[in-house]
UniProtKB/Swiss-Prot annotation:
Protein residues bound to ATP: 151-207
Keywords recorded for this protein, A-Z: ATP-binding, Glutathione biosynthesis, Ligase, Magnesium, Manganese, Metal-binding, Nucleotide-binding
Record-listed Mg(2+) binding positions: 280, 282
UniProt-recorded name of the protein: Glutathione synthetase
NCBIfam families assigned to the protein according to its UniProt record, in alphabetical order: glut_syn (TIGR01380), PRK05246.1 (NF003573)
A GO CC annotation given for this chain: cytoplasm
Species of origin: Bradyrhizobium diazoefficiens (strain JCM 10833 / BCRC 13528 / IAM 13628 / NBRC 14792 / USDA 110)
MF terms (GO), sorted A to Z: ATP binding; glutathione synthase activity; metal ion binding
Annotated Pfam families: GSH-S_ATP (PF02955), GSH-S_N (PF02951)
Protein family according to the UniProt entry: Belongs to the prokaryotic GSH synthase family.
Domain ATP-grasp: 125-309
Pathway connected to this protein: Sulfur metabolism; glutathione biosynthesis; glutathione from L-cysteine and L-glutamate: step 2/2
UniProt cross-references to PANTHER family, sorted A to Z: GLUTATHIONE SYNTHETASE, RIBOSOMAL PROTEIN S6 MODIFICATION PROTEIN
C-alpha cells in the first residue's frame, strides 16, 4: 500500500535529525514508498469548508546538514491526502489549538495522526490527571493559599507551567525556600494559566523514563538521566539516554493508560514515568524514537507505520 502523506511540522531546516522523532517517521515512510509532502502550520488556510496549504514534495536523507530536499510549493487541499502527520512542537497555544480545529474538518476521511480533537482535549499535564492513582501528589493551581497548603503537606515540590515543554521553566522548591515568593511573582506575571505543583521525586536523579505507546500498546522506552547539576532529564536540556527495561509497575501503567489512548485515536504517545510515578502524557509531538533505536531497542517508527497502514486499509 502506497500512501500520500503530508506532514505538518516546524521548519525542517532547523530540526536536529539525531534526536528528531518526526524525521524518523519520515525516513520510515519514505523507505516504504509513501509519498511525502511538507508544510508548516502557519501556512494552513480555510476557504469555506476546504482546508488548503502550499505543500512541497519532500525527500529526506539521514545526513546531518543535508537531510532534506523540497520541491516547489503547490497549493493543495489536505483532504486529498491519505494521512496527515500533526507533528509541530508546542507551545500549546491558541495557534496550535486553531490548527487542531482546522485538521478536525478533514479527519478521519484523511487520517490525522494524532486525532486533532483528542490532541486539543488532552493537554499533557492535564490529561494525566485522569489517572491520579498512578501519579505523585499533584496540584494544578495559581492560588497562593492552595499552593502553600500543598507545600506544607508534601515538602519539596516541582513547580512548572501548565503548557510548558522541553523542560523550560521547571523549578524545584524546597520547604521554607526563600526564593518561593519571587518565583511565585515571576510565574504570576509570566504564565496566566494555572501552574503544576508536584511532589518532588528524589529518584529522578536515576532517570525519567520515556515510554512510547503505539495505538495504546507498549512500543519502546528510553531512560533519560539528568546531568549531575540539573533537575531536568529532557535530552534537549542535556539529559543522557540509557537503555532500559520496563518494571512490573511500568507495565501496569501502560495497561491502564493504553485503552484510553486507543479510544481517543491517540496513536503515537509518549508517557513519562519517574520511580513508578506517571508524570506526563505527551500527545502533541512525542520524542524518543531515535534514542530508542540508537540503543538497540525496538523499531518504533516501523510500528507506527504498520498501524497507520492497517487503519488506512480498513
Amino acid at each position: 500500500m502506497k500512501l500520500n502523506v503530508a506532514v505538518q511540522m516546524d521548519p525542517i531546516a532547523r530540526i536536529n535529525i539525531k534526536g528528531d522523532s518526526t524525521f524518523a517517521l519520515l525516513l520510515e515512510a519514505q523507505k516504504r514508498g509513501h509519498g511525502l509532502s511538507y508544510y508548516t502550520p502557519d501556512k494552513l488556510s480555510m476557504i469555506g469548508e476546504e482546508l488548503v496549504a502550499p505543500v512541497q514534495l519532500l525527500t529526506v536523507r539521514d545526513e546531518p546538514g543535508d537531510h532534506f530536499t523540497l520541491g516547489e510549493p503547490k497549493r493543495e487541499a489536505l483532504n486529498g491526502f491519505d494521512v496527515v502527520l500533526l507533528r509541530q512542537d508546542p507551545p500549546f497555544d491558541l495557534a496550535y489549538i486553531t490548527s487542531t480545529h482546522f485538521l478536525e474538518r478533514i479527519h478521519p476521511k484523511t487520517l490525522v495522526v494524532n486525532d486533532p480533537a483528542s490532541v486539543r482535549n488532552a493537554p499533557e499535564k492535564l490529561f494525566v490527571m485522569n489517572f491520579p492513582q498512578l501519579m505523585p501528589p499533584t496540584l494544578i493551581s495559581r492560588d497562593l493559599d492552595e499552593i502553600n497548603a500543598f507545600r506544607d503537606k508534601h515538602g519539596a515540590v516541582v513547580m512548572k507551567p501548565l503548557h510548558g515543554h522541553g523542560g523550560a521553566a521547571v523549578f524545584r522548591v524546597m520547604p521554607q525556600d526563600m526564593n518561593f515568593g519571587s518565583l511565585f511573582d515571576m510565574f504570576t506575571v509570566t504564565f496566566k494559566e494555572p501552574w503544576v505543583i508536584q511532589q518532588f521525586i528524589p529518584e529522578v536523579k536515576h532517570g525519567d523514563k520515556r515510554i512510547i505507546l503505539v495505538n495504546g500498546e507498549f512500543a519502546g522506552a528510553v531512560n533519560r538521566v539528568p546531568a549531575a547539576d540539573d533537575l531536568r532529564s529532557n535530552m534537549v536540556r542535556g539529559g543522557a539516554a540509557q537503555e532500559t527495561e520496563l518494571t512490573p509497575r511500568e507495565r501496569e501503567i501502560c495497561a491502564t493508560v493504553g485503552p484510553a489512548l486507543r479510544e481517543r485515536g491517540l496513536l503515537f504517545v509518549g508517557i513519562d514515568v519517574i520511580n513508578g510515578n506517571l508524570t506526563e502524557i505527551n500527545v502533541t509531538s512525542p520524542t524518543g524514537i531515535r534514542a530508542i533505536a540508537r540503543l538497540g531497542g525496538p523499531d518504533v517508527a516501523a510500528k507506527v507505520w504498520d498501524t497507520i497502514e492497517q487503519k488506512r486499509a480498513k
